[in-house]
């Protein structure tokens, strides 16, 4: 009978640690890396590079998009920081959990139970906080996507050859070209006519087509950004659903852990299974924290 109780306890405790580890591993390997933020950082810089290539109306939309993308990134990293904090708690508590197996007794078993419940409870709370931050990130992406649709419409109007913005760009090009032609005159009135004729040919044959190409490139940039933002929003939404499943699983195993008797006679294999599960989660936490800049990692107890 004692052996059956021990096996049941091992199964519950091992499942508790592995469920928490699975949620963290999911966050570490998928959710935390689902958005290519390096690409987004470069994109945000590019937004400023094009500021001379669109109308004031479009400029306002671009400014809004930039703010929304930065806000989405901030919210995303809030979630990352929340999980980082959970890792800090987990590594300390699981190290203590492992050490309590030395000269095992009922008091130490009770302490181990408290430790696991604390880890699971903190995991539910921290991952729910992360979920809220991810919701904010997703909402900002969604709003940015709406602004990008409005921007595409605005740029289509701006870059039409009949638009006032396009004509203002052509007028600017003509003014600069004719001013340059006049400045280079050395052959009197006839030279001026010839220079203006050359300038007109350059404007119509080269500069205006180049303007069209440049404006088209700007619109293509924002079209590509729109696709990226929509995909990022879809990825976060899918990840949130998966994370919600992980949180629910932790909540369920926490309830089972609370009703499980911890003080039982473990054999060597049972101890190895429990210590192995705890050490694996410590390593998962260390991996996560190291990827986020932590230099000194907690060593796994070896007993």
Curated annotation (Swiss-Prot):
A Pfam family reported for this protein in Swiss-Prot or TrEMBL: HlyE
Sequence intervals crossing the membrane: 179-199
Subcellular location field: Secreted; Periplasm; Host cell membrane
Record's GO cellular component terms: extracellular region; host cell plasma membrane; membrane; periplasmic space
SUPFAM superfamilies named in the record: Bacterial hemolysins (SSF58100)
InterPro entries: Hemolysin_E
Keyword Repeat: no
UniProt keyword list: Cytolysis, Disulfide bond, Hemolysis, Host cell membrane, Host membrane, Membrane, Periplasm, Secreted, Toxin, Transmembrane, Transmembrane helix, Virulence
Record carries keyword Membrane: yes
GO molecular function, one term: toxin activity
GO biological process assignments: hemolysis in another organism
Membrane topology: Single-pass membrane protein
Post-translational modifications reported in the UniProt record: In periplasm, it forms a disulfide bond, which prevents the oligomerization. In outer membrane vesicles, the redox status prevents formation of the disulfide bond, leading to oligomerization and pore formation.
Disulfide feature: 87-285
Functional note: Toxin, which has some hemolytic activity towards mammalian cells. Acts by forming a pore-like structure upon contact with mammalian cells.
Subunit organization: Monomer and oligomer. In periplasm, it is present as a monomer, while in outer membrane vesicles, it oligomerizes to form a pore structure that is active. The pore is formed by a dodecamer.
Family designation: Belongs to the hemolysin E family.
Name of the molecule in the record: Hemolysin E
Organism of provenance: Salmonella paratyphi A (strain ATCC 9150 / SARB42)
Name of the coding gene: hlyE
């Amino acid at each position: 009978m004692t052996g059956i109780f021990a096996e049941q306890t091992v199964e519950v405790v091992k499942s508790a640690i592995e469920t928490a580890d699975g949620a963290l591993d999911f966050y570490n390997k998928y959710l935390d890396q689902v958005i290519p933020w390096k690409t987004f950082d470069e994109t945000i810089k590019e937004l400023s590079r094009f500021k001379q290539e669109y109308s004031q109306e479009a400029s306002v939309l671009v400014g809004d998009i930039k703010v929304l993308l930065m806000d989405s990134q901030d919210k995303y990293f809030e979630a990352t920081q929340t999980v980082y904090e959970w890792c800090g708690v987990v590594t300390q508590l699981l190290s203590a959990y492992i050490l309590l197996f030395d000269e095992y007794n009922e008091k130490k078993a009770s302490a181990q139970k408290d430790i696991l419940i604390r880890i699971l409870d903190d995991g539910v709370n921290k991952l729910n906080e992360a979920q809220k931050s991810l919701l904010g990130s997703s909402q900002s992406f969604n709003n940015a996507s709406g602004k990008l649709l409005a921007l595409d419409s605005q740029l289509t109007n701006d870059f039409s050859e009949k638009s006032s913005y396009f004509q203002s760009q052509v007028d600017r090009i003509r003014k600069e070209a004719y001013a340059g032609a006049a400045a280079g005159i050395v052959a009197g009135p006839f030279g001026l006519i010839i220079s203006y004729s050359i300038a007109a040919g350059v404007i119509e044959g080269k500069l205006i087509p180049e303007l069209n190409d440049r404006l088209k490139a700007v619109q293509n940039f924002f079209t590509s950004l729109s696709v990226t933002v929509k995909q990022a929003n879809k990825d976060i939404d899918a990840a949130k659903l998966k994370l919600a499943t992980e949180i629910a699983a932790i909540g369920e195993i926490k309830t089972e852990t609370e009703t499980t008797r911890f003080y039982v006679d473990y054999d060597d294999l049972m101890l190895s299974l429990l210590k192995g599960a705890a050490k694996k989660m410590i390593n998962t936490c260390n991996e996560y924290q190291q990827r986020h800049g932590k230099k000194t990692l907690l060593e796994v107890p070896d007993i």
